[in-house]
Design a protein with these regions (language model features):
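A broad, low-specificity signal for short, low-complexity segments enriched in glycine/proline
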Residues: 67-69, 128-133, 166-176
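Internal glycine-rich, Lys/Arg-flanked active-site/core loops of soluble domains
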Residues: 112, 120-123, 128-164
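Conserved short secondary-structure elements within globular domains
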Residues: 146-218
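N-terminal leader/targeting and assembly helices and adjacent pre-domain segments
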Residues: 1-131, 216-342
């Protein structure tokens, strides 16, 4: 099943109409960066798509802008600096993989029906529909999902401060918009340590509005584990690929490793799990896996403070290091030829 078919299956037009619009200025900025990225793609030579364009300044500028759009969805949500940094990293990787698909889909449009290279104006006009599909239609739903994931990740962080002192209870919004399959999970009550929350912690789908609250143990009886798992399985029966079965707070990610822009085995891949000694680990011989590896390498050179921008020399110095030494929590500067880390 292709990417757009997967999206049609898990998204649907009804969901798109529920998604909140992206601010016009953000959408316009993304549109400009898309055009610049297409200009870089237009200059590529050769008959085959070169994934290294992902690391180009134009593509990185687009990825960073797309990441910023997603980050803006939880700008006012209270959470630790570490959680925010890791959610931003998740947004960057998600944006990078999405960008790979946009570039890969745009590449064949470089040639006309006779096999001749188009003018840039015609090429850009032809790929505008790709921009509209990915960065308007899909982005609206992705923005909402990231916002919900971040809010629930922040909640999970607070839940963990209390450990199993309280039970956690699944709650719906109790209105006519609640999906019947989610309604069955309402009032499921379990300790935070129960594995139920690893698979059925909200959001459990695009535009899912479900939440989880802490409740006193003396007031509620816990739901039997097997019963809760059965209800969860029934609630997500339409999610046959298991795309939404993750805990954003526990994994510290806004989007699961397996999403519309990746493949099923990404859930168990060392790259996706952040095991960064990748030079010793084999990578599947396909463009998606190679793109994922490159996106993670770029993410390791990506700064999260929003205040420091790496020079080209700084970035190259980081990327020249072994992969297991590239990742750092905060870039603080360079003294001589030594990278300074916190």
């Amino acid at each position: 099943m292709g990417l757009h078919q997967r999206y049609a299956t898990i998204l649907g037009n009804k969901t798109l109409t529920l998604a909140a619009p992206i601010k016009d200025e953000l959408r316009e900025e993304l549109r400009k960066k898309f055009a610049k990225m297409m200009s870089a793609l237009f200059k590529q030579k050769g008959a085959n798509f070169d994934i290294n364009i992902i690391a180009s300044d134009e593509a990185q500028d687009f990825i960073n802008t797309h990441t910023s759009v997603l980050d803006s969805s939880f700008q006012k949500v209270e959470m630790s600096d570490l959680m925010r940094q890791r959610l931003t990293r998740s947004n960057y990787i998600f944006s990078g993989m999405k960008t790979f698909h946009e570039l890969n889909e745009a590449f064949p449009s470089l040639l006309d029906e006779n096999g001749n290279k188009k003018t840039f104006e015609r090429f850009l006009n032809d790929v505008r529909k790709i921009d509209e599909t990915y960065n308007s239609n899909y982005l609206r739903a992705e923005y909402n999902f990231v916002q919900a994931s971040a809010e629930m990740a922040a909640k999970w962080e607070k839940f963990m401060e209390d450990g199993d002192h309280y039970y956690l209870q699944y709650r719906t919004q109790h209105d006519d918009k609640v999906r019947p399959e989610h309604a069955s999970l309402d009032r499921v009550t379990l300790p935070p340590s129960d594995s139920f929350w690893e698979s059925y912690y909200p959001p459990n789908g695009w535009n899912c509005r479900c939440t989880v609250v802490q409740v006193l143990k003396r007031k509620y009886e816990p739901t039997p584990h097997d019963e809760a798992m059965s209800l969860g399985e029934e609630a997500l029966q339409t999610d046959k690929k298991g795309i939404f079965r993750f805990n954003s707070g526990k994994e510290q990610k806004t989007v699961p490793d397996y999403n519309p822009y990746t493949i099923k085995r990404c859930r168990d891949c060392d790259i996706a799990k952040g095991k960064l000694n990748l030079e010793k680990a084999p990578v599947a011989d396909n463009q998606l896996c190679e793109a994922c590896k490159l996106v993670h390498k770029c993410a390791n050179a990506h700064t999260y403070s929003g205040k420091t921008k790496l020079t080209f020399e700084d970035r190259d110095a980081i990327l020249a290091k072994p992969l297991n030494k590239q990742y750092f929590t905060k870039y603080t500067g360079i003294k001589g030829k030594v990278l300074q880390h916190e």
